[in-house]
Amino acid sequence: MTNAFRDMNSLNYLKSFADSSTAARSFSFEPTPQARVKYGGVFLFWSRQSEQQYFENLRARIPSGLTATLVFQTLTAQSLQSDSAQYEATYTLTAPHSVASIPKQATGKAQFLLLADRSRNWVLWRWIDVPTGSSSFSWSDLKGEFGQ
């Protein structure tokens, strides 16, 4: 996922998420409670395709020659098995987009639930964005802004 942001490659970003045609589950995203309230119906039917649309909308607003940066400050395994895993991570996503009214940095914590797809690639099937402070701009907020 970090490489997908570095390269601003939506196909590589999409490969991070479970697809029901190749995995036992479909992808689901749970935004922070604050973002769920703020962006209303945007997250109601959020899917793998929503992730692709958000990423492409964000990429379209980043000037040529610039790139986004995703950093996981901590990445802790909560559970590891041969076909599934759960991680908790703190993140900073910096996106030098051109929309003045939207913050360029999202920070927070996420819980990632992964499974091995039919090709034995690890993919996210559930992503829970966890609030870290009432005033912080989270990844959920960035998705809410660019996922519309």
PLM region descriptions:
Residues 1, 13-14, 51:
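Hydrophobic pocket/interface hotspot
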Residues 9-32:
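Short, well-ordered alpha-helical segments enriched in acidic and aromatic residues
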Residues 30, 71-75, 115:
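A structural detector for beta-sheet-dominated domains
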Residues 36-103:
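Surface-exposed, charged secondary-structure patches
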